[in-house]
């Protein structure tokens, strides 16, 4: 017969004589190995009628306790007749196998190595010394066995892992704990063993875990120093000089040694005091786990586990042990023991024991008890108790064959836990935990007939001795069994067997090599993903466990969410419907949690109508009940001043000189050293469409403010006529600014830096009215110098006041001059001009507009001890005033730039009125400048903002376009505008490429459209033709807009597509061409004038082109005709026809100039 000789796939055949006489066997000569001098003492054969004592049972007698040896029969650790865990080989003839018996049980009498007998150095379960036969008359082969054939080193004889001398407990050739291939058929002590460490007479079947046919020393066999050896340091071993080996804990006779499992004083299973399963010297019997003193299953006076004494508390002993027979042991038969025989034991014989015996029973049998006639009681009266009880473990119906009940947990019939029928724990027929069948009338404790833990007959008990099922350590399929699927068996499913064992070579072992159908870890055909049910088959990485099937990694078909490897479907968290996620859900948002403010369900905290409840103390004063923003206590700084580093005040209140703190860390934007994030030259990533994104405004350094200054004196018409609406207005006729005698030298120097040598007509006309304190309304075409026209006189006034109040410090930002403009770009441009003009004068200029980080904006305004000039948009100004960040109490002068929008009641008029008040109440001087004023504004809105007697100044005519702009009007239907723009710019409409000498290559062009979205689209179309193009609109954040405008001004881009944000006030140097791709609406007269006014500024000439759709732009055509006429431009005939009937009376808004 062949079997696995190394437990890993290789096969070998070893034939052994049927009967081996007891004699010393010389060791083989092994030059590389150092032999040991220790020899094995022989032991007499044990009588098969000797009571059993191991973790296992005896089919003939009935023991009462768990590990007791007071009666011939045994259960869990009983007398040494059956060969269970820690069993004895004495009953081998009747029981065939033990899990720790004298022969080759776990913890047997062998000596050397882990399962070995001899003394070879560093062998794993090996032995090399010739010794006398152990008690069974054969060499040991099991786990801790003695060598049958001494043959070389570990893993060297026939390459077996469990070989004769150094195998993992093996003595011959095969498997995990298998013995050699012997043929002896003796019965009794020399029976073949199959348990873990069991010893039996060899048969045609290979041996089990830790066994060898006809050999004594399995796991803890008969040698000396093995794991459980018999001499000094074995795990449960026998003392030197012992005549018997008894499996796991051994029996001692004379002296003792202190090995691990030795029989001396401190060994694990030692024989005197504290061993695990040790027994006393001179004891008549050795019964596996129970030994003499304090061992696990000890026998004599101390307190061993399952000891048999009557005075101590051994676990399972006679007195108080676990399963003891006297007083209060675990399973004892007296009064309060666990499973005692009287009343309250766990499994006691009276009324309330769990597993108690039926009324009238004469014996107590520990955990599950034996019954005789009838039973009764309820829960608490029989853990495996009486047939009529219904309690925990109680039966419910009577089995006709046994007279017991069937359904109790530990009941007497079939499915009880410990019942003796079919599925009980320790039951007597099939599936008990350690059950056996000695007869159907007797059920004695945990071990029962068949599939019990340590069971004996056909099914699959732990350590059972049958030949056809899967007992743990049995002959058939036990743990270390010899036939089918034992642990270490050599047949079909054993651990380390030839078919599917651990390392088996055939079907499905660990590291299996050929069979493709089963399921070992790393089996032949599928490796870690085999077909069925081991690690790597239906387990890890296969169809039903980890990595597949219905556990970790992928669910099975019948589970919720079988997605066949696809993405797991997930419904909307808001509405529960599939097909979209919650952020795309068009249903109203449903709160899933209580409101964080009022803790009520049904609404969000942002929608809560209850007063806001602070969740902690005030961050300012530390008192509960209010927020820091509502705290009435003075604000307490949490750290040192950021300016001077001193404690006790905020940076905004710091009286020390403003100190620029050098950065101590890299810039947060570019990670470079040497500058703060707000000074970073790089720009953050564009966030298109996020127009609410704020940023830190980057100011132009003082030394670079004048780099873009251009002298345009040769292009400006200084002879333009200025008309005043009031009596006599002195308009000085000066060729240069030197004629302004009151002009301070610092201001004069700054004008030279700005390359302003001569005042423009509007600057000359507005100078003295403003200096005299009059309210002024000035109208001049774009690019005529309006900004300096109001700045120069006001700066002169501010410089005079600053000399008087130089030491005054404002508690909060309080501007003296307030300039309000409609767009951020115009605010920024005006602020830059004001900084240039006040350079080195001591005056401080600030700005405020949306898009600039609010906190940074506030800090910017607070950084001045005096704020002389503030340039702001209406929205941010209103915010700061309402929040108390800015005070207007010291304001003396107000300027409304692009005033036609600022005073229009349909635009900013209402907000401006709230800020500056009515003219009758207002003491401040007010100046309004714009490129156009309609008659309606003059009559209806201007009186609300300026005082009576104001001065109106006009350069040429109100609302006229700059004559230096060449206006072209083209009839283009809406559907043909794209082709028209391509043609106008010099782009081939078929190939979308630039034509030779394309006009766009020579002209800086600004294209206006009405749709914000179409800005980006048209810019992309033009850019695809190879023209450097960029877009600018209100949906961009302010930093994008500033950067775009700056890049276009500097010539980085040749073309820009913009919405109306670029229509007013922007000075774009060198702009050659303005295109109105879309015309303004019917109210867009002023808008058209301002759009085309971006070119032809400061005396330069420019060109404008308008695409007019006759069908859709009919409302603006009359206004357009009038503008062309007044600008002395040719009006196309088709445009005049388009005006049609609207000509008559349609231009009353453009009547002749009034008499002033």
From Swiss-Prot:
It comes from the Eukaryota. Residues 1-81, 194-213, 231-423, 436-522, 1135-1156 are annotated as: Disordered. Residues 1145-1156 have a biased composition (Acidic residues). Probable ATP-binding RNA helicase. May act redundantly with the P-granule component glh-1 to regulate the formation of the granular structure of P-granules in embryos. May protect somatic cells from excessive apoptosis during normal development. Residues 259-281, 321-332, 342-358, 408-423, 478-489 have a biased composition (Gly residues). Keywords: ATP-binding, Helicase, Hydrolase, Metal-binding, Nucleotide-binding, Repeat, RNA-binding, Zinc, Zinc-finger. Its EC number is 3.6.4.13. A zinc finger (CCHC-type) spans 570-587, 593-610, 616-633, 639-656, 665-682. One of its GO terms (cellular component) is P granule. It catalyses: ATP + H2O = ADP + phosphate + H(+). SUPFAM superfamilies: P-loop containing nucleoside triphosphate hydrolases, Retrovirus zinc finger-like domains. This is ATP-dependent RNA helicase glh-4. Residues 60-73, 194-211, 243-258, 307-319, 362-371, 395-406, 440-451, 464-476 have a biased composition (Polar residues). Interacts (via C-terminus) with kgb-1. Pfam families: DEAD, Helicase_C, zf-CCHC. Disulfide bonds: none annotated. The keyword Chloroplast does not apply. The keyword Cell division does not apply. A motif (Q motif) lies at residues 736-764. Residues 767-951 form the Helicase ATP-binding domain. Residues 12-22 have a biased composition (Basic and acidic residues). Belongs to the DEAD box helicase family. DDX4/VASA subfamily. One of its GO terms (biological process) is maturation of SSU-rRNA. ATP binds at residues 780-787. GO terms for molecular function: ATP binding; ATP hydrolysis activity; JUN kinase binding; RNA binding; RNA helicase activity; zinc ion binding.
């Amino acid at each position: 017969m062949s079997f696995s000789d190394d437990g890993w796939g290789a096969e070998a055949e070893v034939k052994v004589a049927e009967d081996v006489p007891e004699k010393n066997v010389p060791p083989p000569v092994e030059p590389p190995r150092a032999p040991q001098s220790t020899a094995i003492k022989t032991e007499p054969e044990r009588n098969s009628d000797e009571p059993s004592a191991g973790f296992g049972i005896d089919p003939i007698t009935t023991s009462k306790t768990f590990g007791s040896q007071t009666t011939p029969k045994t259960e869990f650790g009983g007398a040494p007749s059956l060969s269970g865990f820690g069993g004895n080989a004495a009953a081998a003839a009747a029981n065939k196998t033990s899990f720790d018996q004298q022969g080759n049980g776990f913890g047997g009498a062998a000596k050397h190595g882990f399962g070995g007998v001899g003394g070879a150095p560093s062998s794993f379960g090996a032995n090399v010394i010739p010794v006398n036969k152990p008690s069974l008359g054969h060499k040991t082969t099991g786990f801790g066995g003695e060598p049958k054939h001494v043959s070389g080193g570990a893993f060297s004889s026939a390459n077996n892992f469990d070989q004769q001398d150094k195998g993992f407990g093996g003595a011959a050739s095969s498997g995990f704990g298998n013995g050699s291939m012997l043929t002896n058929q003796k019965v009794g002590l020399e029976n073949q063993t199959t348990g873990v460490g069991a010893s039996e007479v060899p048969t045609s079947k290979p041996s089990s875990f830790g066994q060898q046919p006809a050999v004594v020393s399995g796991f803890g066999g008969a040698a000396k120093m093995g794991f459980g050896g018999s001499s000094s340091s074995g795990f449960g071993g026998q003392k030197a000089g012992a005549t018997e080996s008894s499996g796991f804990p051994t029996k001692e006779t004379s002296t003792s040694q202190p090995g691990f499992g030795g029989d001396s004083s401190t060994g694990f299973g030692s024989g005197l005091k504290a061993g695990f399963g040790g027994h006393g010297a001179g004891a008549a019997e050795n019964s596996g786990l129970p030994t003499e003193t304090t061992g696990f299953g000890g026998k004599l006076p101390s307190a061993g586990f399952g000891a048999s004494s009557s005075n101590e508390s051994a676990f399972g002993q006679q007195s108080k042990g676990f399963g003891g027979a006297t007083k209060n042991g675990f399973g004892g038969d007296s009064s309060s023991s666990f499973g005692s025989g009287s009343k309250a034991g766990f499994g006691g014989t009276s009324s309330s024991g769990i597993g108690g015996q039926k009324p009238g029973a004469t014996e107590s049998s520990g955990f599950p008890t034996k019954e005789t006639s009838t039973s009764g009681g309820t829960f608490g009266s029989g853990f495996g108790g009486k047939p009529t009880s219904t309690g925990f473990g109680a039966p419910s119906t009577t089995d006709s064959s046994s007279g017991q009940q069937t359904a109790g947990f530990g009941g007497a019939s079939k499915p009880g836990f410990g019942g003796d029928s079919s599925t009980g724990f320790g039951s007597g027929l099939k599936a008990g935990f350690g059950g056996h069948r000695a007869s159907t009338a007797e059920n004695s404790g945990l071990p029962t007939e068949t599939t019990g833990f340590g069971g004996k007959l056909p099914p699959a008990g732990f350590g059972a001795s049958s030949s056809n099922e899967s007992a743990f350590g049995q002959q058939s399929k036990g743990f270390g069994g010899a036939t089918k699927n034992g642990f270490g068996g050599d047949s079909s499913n054993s651990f380390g067997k030839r078919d599917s064992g651990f390392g088996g070579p055939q079907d499905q072992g660990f590291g299996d090599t050929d069979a493709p159908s089963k399921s070992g870890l790393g089996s032949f055909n599928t490796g870690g993903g085999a077909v069925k049910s081991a690690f790597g088959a239906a387990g890890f990485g296969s169809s039903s466990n980890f990595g597949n099937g219905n556990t970790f990694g992928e669910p099975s078909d019948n589970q919720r969410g079988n997605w066949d490897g696809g993405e797991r479907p997930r419904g909307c968290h808001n509405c529960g419907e599939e097909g979209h996620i919650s952020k795309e859900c068009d249903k109203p948002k449903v709160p899933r949690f209580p409101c964080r403010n009022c803790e009520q369900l049904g609404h969000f905290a942002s929608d809560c109508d209850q007063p806001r409840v602070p969740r902690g103390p005030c961050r300012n004063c530390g008192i509960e009940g209010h927020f820091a923003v509502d705290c009435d206590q003075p604000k307490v700084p949490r750290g040192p001043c950021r300016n001077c580093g001193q404690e006790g005040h905020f940076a905004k209140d710091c009286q020390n000189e403003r100190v620029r703190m050098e950065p101590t860390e890299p810039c947060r934007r570019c990670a470079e050293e040497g500058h703060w994030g707000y000074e970073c030259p790089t720009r953050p990533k564009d966030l298109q469409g996020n127009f609410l994104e704020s940023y830190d405004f980057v100011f132009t350094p003082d030394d670079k403010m004048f780099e873009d200054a251009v002298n345009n004196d040769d292009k400006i018409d200084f002879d333009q006529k200025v008309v005043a609406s009031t009596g006599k207005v002195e308009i000085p006729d000066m060729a240069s600014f030197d004629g302004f005698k009151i002009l301070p030298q610092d201001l004069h120097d700054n004008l030279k830096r700005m390359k302003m040598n001569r005042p423009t007509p509007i600057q000359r006309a507005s100078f003295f009215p403003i200096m005299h304190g009059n309210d002024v309304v000035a109208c001049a075409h774009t690019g005529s110098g309006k900004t300096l026209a109001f700045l120069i006189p006001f700066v002169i006034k501010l410089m005079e006041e600053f000399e008087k109040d130089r030491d005054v410090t404002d508690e909060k930002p309080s501007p003296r001059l307030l300039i309000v403009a409609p767009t951020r770009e115009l605010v920024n441009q005006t602020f830059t001009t004001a900084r240039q003009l006040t350079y080195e004068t001591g005056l401080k200029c600030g700005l405020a507009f949306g898009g600039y980080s609010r906190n940074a904006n506030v800090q910017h305004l607070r950084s001045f001890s005096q704020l002389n000039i503030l340039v702001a948009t209406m929205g941010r100004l209103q915010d700061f005033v309402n929040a108390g960040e800015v005070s207007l109490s010291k304001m003396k002068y107000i300027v409304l730039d692009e005033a036609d929008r600022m005073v229009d009641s349909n635009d900013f008029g209402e907000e401006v009125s709230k800020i500056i008040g009515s003219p009758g109440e207002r003491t401040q001087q007010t100046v309004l400048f714009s490129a156009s004023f309609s008659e309606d504004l003059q009559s209806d809105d201007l009186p609300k903002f300026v005082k009576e007697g104001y001065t109106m100044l006009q350069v040429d005519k109100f609302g006229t376009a700059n004559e230096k702009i060449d206006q072209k009007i083209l009839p283009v239907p809406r559907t043909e505008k794209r082709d028209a723009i391509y043609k106008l710019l010099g782009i081939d409409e078929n190939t979308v490429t630039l034509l030779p000498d394309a006009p766009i290559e020579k002209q800086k062009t600004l294209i206006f459209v009405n749709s914000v979205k179409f800005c980006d689209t048209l810019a992309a179309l033009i850019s695809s033709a190879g023209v450097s193009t960029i877009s600018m609109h209100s949906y961009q954040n302010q930093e994008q807009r500033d950067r775009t405008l700056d890049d276009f001004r500097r010539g980085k881009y040749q073309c820009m597509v913009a919405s109306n944000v670029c229509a007013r006030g922007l000075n774009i140097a060198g702009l050659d061409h303005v295109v109105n791709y879309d015309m303004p609406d019917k109210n867009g007269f002023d808008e058209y004038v301002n759009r085309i006014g971006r070119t032809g500024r400061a005396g330069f000439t420019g060109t404008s082109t308008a695409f007019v759709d006759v069908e859709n732009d009919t409302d603006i055509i009359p206004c357009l005709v009038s503008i062309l006429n007044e600008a002395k431009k040719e009006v196309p005939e088709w445009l005049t026809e388009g005006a049609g009937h609207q000509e008559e009376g349609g231009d009353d808004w453009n009547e002749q100039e009034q008499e002033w």
